[in-house]
Curated annotation (Swiss-Prot):
Listed name of the protein: Small ribosomal subunit protein uS11
Subunit structure as annotated in this protein's UniProt entry: Part of the 30S ribosomal subunit.
InterPro entries: Ribosomal_uS11, Ribosomal_uS11_archaeal, Ribosomal_uS11_CS, Ribosomal_uS11_sf
GO CC aspect terms: ribonucleoprotein complex; ribosome
SUPFAM superfamilies reported for this sequence: Translational machinery components
Pfam families: Ribosomal_S11 (PF00411)
Family: Belongs to the universal ribosomal protein uS11 family.
Coiled-coil residue windows: none
Gene Ontology molecular function, alphabetical: rRNA binding; structural constituent of ribosome
A single BP term in Gene Ontology: translation
Keywords: Ribonucleoprotein, Ribosomal protein, RNA-binding, rRNA-binding
Presence of keyword Plastid: no
Function: Located on the platform of the 30S subunit.
Length: 132
């Protein structure tokens, strides 16, 4: 008898801003966090937090923790700050996705979940702008 092992799916959420990259791997419902890591946890200097190298290290750490806990396949959701901030992901998004793919996961789908306003939104700083 060949007993086929059921594949355990999860969600990898990548938040890539200009200041940091945060990777959170949850179960398929998103309710239980299995592992998380950020670029700031991997490097010493603050200026290196948003770097692609820090994002790659963070994705490797989160992936190894999730693989140890039995996760085999993931769907990836990439998010930029959005809203009043930039709508494009930061420099760590691509290396994080590549690192998750190389770590041995089965990749289901990759989607962008950046919040985009459907009307205009008021920028921070007020009517007279940011006074320096």
């Amino acid at each position: 008898m060949s007993s086929k092992r059921e594949i355990r799916w999860g969600l990898a959420r990548i938040y890539a801003s200009q200041n940091n990259t945060i990777i959170t791997i949850t179960d398929i419902t998103g309710a239980e966090v299995i592992s998380k890591a950020s670029g700031g946890m991997m490097v010493k200097a603050d200026r290196e937090k948003p770097s692609p190298y820090a994002a790659m290290l963070a994705a490797n750490k989160a992936a190894s923790d999730a693989l140890d806990k039995g996760l085999m396949a993931i769907h990836i959701k990439v998010r930029a700050p959005g809203g009043a901030g930039p709508k494009t992901p930061g420099p760590g998004a691509q290396p994080a996705i590549r690192s998750l793919a190389r770590s041995g996961f089965i990749i289901g789908r990759i989607e962008d979940v950046t919040p985009i306003p459907h009307d205009t939104i008021r920028r921070p700083g007020g009517r007279r702008g940011r006074r320096v």
